[in-house]
From Swiss-Prot:
One of its GO terms (biological process) is translation. InterPro entries: Ribosomal_uL5, Ribosomal_uL5_bac-type, Ribosomal_uL5_C, Ribosomal_uL5_CS, Ribosomal_uL5_dom_sf, Ribosomal_uL5_N. Keywords: Ribonucleoprotein, Ribosomal protein, RNA-binding, rRNA-binding, tRNA-binding. Belongs to the universal ribosomal protein uL5 family. It holds the Pfam family Ribosomal_L5_C. GO terms for molecular function: rRNA binding; structural constituent of ribosome; tRNA binding. This is one of the proteins that bind and probably mediate the attachment of the 5S RNA into the large ribosomal subunit, where it forms part of the central protuberance. In the 70S ribosome it contacts protein S13 of the 30S subunit (bridge B1b), connecting the 2 subunits; this bridge is implicated in subunit movement. Contacts the P site tRNA; the 5S rRNA and some of its associated proteins might help stabilize positioning of ribosome-bound tRNAs. It comes from the Bacteria. Part of the 50S ribosomal subunit; part of the 5S rRNA/L5/L18/L25 subcomplex. Contacts the 5S rRNA and the P site tRNA. Forms a bridge to the 30S subunit in the 70S ribosome. This is Large ribosomal subunit protein uL5. The gene is rplE. GO terms for cellular component: ribonucleoprotein complex; ribosome.
Length: 179
């Protein structure tokens, strides 16, 4: 079993039950899934850029990404409906816990001038969104093979009903929030 999942079961669950006075252990919030999205805007003019982004996302997550397509045509961006413009991965179960563990312990501390992640990025339903400016913070990405610095959005979906519960869950799992 993954280190973070073990910590969740043995330490986080009992402390959350105690803090929020749940009547059952099953009421405790848990991480449901993690969605990583990489929008590749320049894929409109050069489709090869998307292949590189897909390759990097597969390296980072250990799972084959889904290529996302444009929902609407936008003339200003020379974009047609159905054109491939990005990639996304949905992680659940073991891979999700492995990715979260790696993100919290290895990748986020590698960000330049890192003072913790924002406490304000919750959506009101207990989900947390995190933007990353460069893919180089992940140890799997080889610096020499990177053609262009790309960012990504990471959405951590929890079963929590409020932001407060979700914040407490993520903080206990090791998410470095700003002081």
């Amino acid at each position: 079993m993954n280190r973070l999942k073990e910590k969740y079961i043995k330490e986080v669950t009992p402390s959350l039950v105690e803090k929020f006075n749940y009547s059952s252990v099953m009421q405790t919030p848990k991480v449901d899934k993690i969605v990583i999205n990489m929008g590749v805007g320049d894929a409109v003019s050069n489709a090869k850029n998307l292949d590189k982004a897909v390759e990097e996302l597969a390296l980072i997550t250990g799972q084959k990404p889904l290529i996302t397509k444009a929902k609407k045509s936008i003339a200003g961006f020379r974009l047609r409906e159905g054109m491939p413009i990005g990639a996304k991965v949905t992680l659940r179960g073991e891979r999700m816990y492995e990715f979260l563990d790696k993100l919290v312990t290895v990748s986020l501390p590698r960000v330049r001038d890192f003072h913790g992640v924002s406490k304000k990025a919750f959506d009101g339903r207990g989900n947390y969104t995190l933007g990353i400016k460069e893919q180089l913070i992940f140890p799997e990405v080889d610096y020499d093979l990177v053609d262009k610095v790309r960012g990504m959005d990471i959405v951590i979906v929890t079963t929590a009903n409020t932001d407060e519960e979700s914040r407490e869950l993520l903080a206990q799992l090791g998410m470095p929030f700003q002081k």
